[in-house]
């Protein structure tokens, strides 16, 4: 069986997320599977590295699919980009080992979150960032971020859909940056629970607004109570930035 790795970019604003929900749904997975199935002449499933939610974007999503026939990578890329909607782009196609699995073989993921932090709205970024109109205390946010780096039980930063055997995840790095009206948050880790990144960003926003003390983060982690974080950052500001294998 021939196995092909896809690197994908998409604007998630109008989609219901990555994961296919039905035969004719408006999802990234569904759109790509439909075109690949047409190309190879049989129903074909793709496996994505990250099941991004509705409204979330990707700069480097990775997926794989298998085919009975040998395919030419550049022709696959050309075909997919010709027939996919223009808010989904295949940036690379690569034949890989038949055991390669986009979800199970990933070693690290990096997400970027964009906050538009000006009093006025930014009409050009409304689908691609979260607007916070009060000035954020970035210094306090950076202090809070330090408490989240490392291996922790992140139950408090998940939602009820997170039903993993272990809620322990390792955050390798968590950066808070200011740039031209934006506050950007970049987080890397070995894996993330459902809504974990958006909850982390939400907690940092609460700290930045003075609604939560940076020093309270360790106690929140220890308590493992989901109701401790009131802010779930909007999907629009979240980007899957990179995946490492």
Swiss-Prot record:
EC numbers for this chain: 5.4.99.12
Q: Which UniProt keywords apply?
A: Isomerase, tRNA processing
This molecule's function is given as: Formation of pseudouridine at positions 38, 39 and 40 in the anticodon stem and loop of transfer RNAs.
SUPFAM superfamilies, per the entry? Pseudouridine synthase (SSF55120)
Asked if the record carries the keyword Glycosyltransferase, the reply is no
Which cysteine pairs make disulfide bonds?
none
Give the first-level EC class, as a single word.
isomerase
What is the gene called? truA2
In Swiss-Prot or TrEMBL terms, this protein is called tRNA pseudouridine synthase A 2
State the active site: 53 (nucleophile)
User: Reaction catalysed by this chain?
Assistant: uridine(38/39/40) in tRNA = pseudouridine(38/39/40) in tRNA
């Amino acid at each position: 069986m021939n196995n092909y790795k896809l690197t994908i970019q998409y604007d998630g604003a109008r989609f219901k997320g990555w994961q296919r929900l039905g035969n004719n749904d408006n999802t990234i997975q569904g759109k790509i599977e439909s075109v690949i199935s047409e190309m190879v002449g049989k129903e074909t499933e793709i496996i994505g590295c990250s099941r991004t939610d509705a409204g979330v974007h990707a700069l480097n999503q990775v997926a794989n699919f298998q085919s009975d026939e040998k395919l030419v990578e550049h022709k696959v890329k050309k075909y997919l980009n010709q027939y996919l909607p223009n808010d989904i782009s295949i940036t690379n196609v690569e034949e890989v080992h038949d055991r390669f699995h986009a979800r199970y073989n990933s070693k690290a993921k990096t997400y970027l979150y964009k906050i538009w932090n000006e009093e006025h709205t930014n009409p050009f970024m409304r689908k691609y960032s979260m607007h916070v109109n009060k000035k954020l205390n970035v210094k306090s946010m950076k202090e809070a971020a330090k408490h989240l780096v490392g291996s922790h039980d992140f139950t408090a930063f998940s939602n009820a859909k997170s039903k993993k055997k272990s809620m322990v995840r390792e955050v390798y790095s968590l950066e808070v940056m200011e740039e031209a009206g934006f506050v950007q948050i970049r987080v890397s880790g070995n894996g993330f629970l459902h809504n974990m990144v958006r909850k982390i960003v939400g907690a940092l926003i609460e700290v930045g607004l003075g609604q939560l003390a940076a020093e309270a983060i360790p106690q929140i982690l220890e308590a493992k109570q989901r109701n401790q974080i009131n802010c779930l950052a909007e999907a629009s500001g979240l980007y899957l930035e990179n995946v490492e294998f």
